[in-house]
Amino acid sequence: MEFPDPPWLNQFRASTNSFLSQYEPLTLLLSPLFALLLAQILQSFFLVIHERGLKATIISWCLVLINTLTLRSRSYIGGNEHEGHFSLINEACSMFAHTNPLHLSVFPSVVRFEAEVVAMTAALLGSKEKTSGGQICGNMTSGGTESILLAVKSSRDYMKAKKGITKPEMIIPVSAHSAYDKAAQYFKIKLWRVPVDKEFRADVKAVNRHINKNTIMIVGSAPGFPHGIIDPIEDLGDLASSYGICLHVDLCLGGFVLPFARKLGYPVPPFDFTVQGVTSISVDVHKYGLAPKGTSVVLYRNHEIRKHQFVAVTEWTGGLYVSPTIAGSRPGGLIAGAWAAMISLGFEGYLENTREIMEASKSIQKGIQDIPELFIIGRPDMSIIAFGSDVVDIFEVNDVMSSKGWHLNALQRPNSVHICVTLQHVPVVQIFLKDLRDSVQTVKENPGPVNGGFAPIYGAAGKMPDRGMVQDLLIEFMDSSC
């Protein structure tokens, strides 16, 4: 949830508005001139800063002020600050902030940290089981997208070496993460999207129909980002094995929840390297692993596949060069922070976190089901709960929830929103459900766009038949935002 503005700030705003209202005509006349003058003063100020720099104490004060005024929401990685979790990983990041694992011999400690993070993550996903083959290996990356990009690139090159495929194709369900679209564009791979079934799981028969001589890989999610539903990984594994192609499982959300949910007795279908046919897995440590942002892991069933991830250059005048991931230099501080997070929490810590998260998720799911105007999308397997409505505009409900401080993700096909339950939600489940009930009632009684809301945009975008136009609008939006 968002935190309310401090009382002094609200009082200042009220006093300012009251004062200006007395001189409204003059204010309207002079405000453009004042704005121009202020812009010139700020421009001159920043030019001086860029040339001369600022003292550390002033920078620290500025950061605190910016954090107070603008960063009003808590972070996604809701660790337990009372036990010093954030302080610990911040200290680890700071201690190794200037290290770079690209230079293996210069920073051996960071290289060791990475190896241990990979090994601990792999152990959660079946590396110690005989059915895994005993060769699970991998690397840390900057996030789930890079992990997926590397898995796709490695699969493409592995299948080229193994089968001679030069016009690669991959098959994904429509619920798969958009990182696969990015990979297809980057690596010149033809992308086939297949529908999901009535339970919003990947349609295995549809996947089978699209497999041909150029297919390099198929994809499953555990769970999928939109609806929190696990694809039939075993069935996809059977397909991959029978055709001799790769199967990547996206565990970016589930990697640090599903192994523990299974341990707690929740009905979790198979999803890891114990499933024959799975050749690679992506899992984010910076989500439910509670590591600093910018830490993920990509894993492979064996070294033969992973070798196709690497880039080696022999003819550069700068010397021999080899790099394991897309980035050359990598921040060793983040690797150290991830290591510290995992070592600190341990199996028992993650188990207890999962217990609380899953209990909160089930309570929220039941609470949503009890709201007659709403319905749950499919049967959520984890802590992501998507819901829609045939009675009210769900995007208008989302806008009202946003005004109350809740930030939910808007989805399409069907129109819906989802909540991704974290530790931050555990103590406020009933507050969330009350706000949701009130928001639904507000929209039901007063339908129509919320001032400043995004419902009209989402609604219009979903109805536009020309998806190329929507794509152009997204690109223009991004170009103007960064």
Predicted feature descriptions by range:
Residues 159-216:
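PLP-dependent aminotransferase-like
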Residues 197, 212, 218-219, 450-460:
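Pyridoxal 5′-phosphate
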Residues 216, 243, 248, 260-383, ...:
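Active-site C-terminal subdomain of aminotransferase-like
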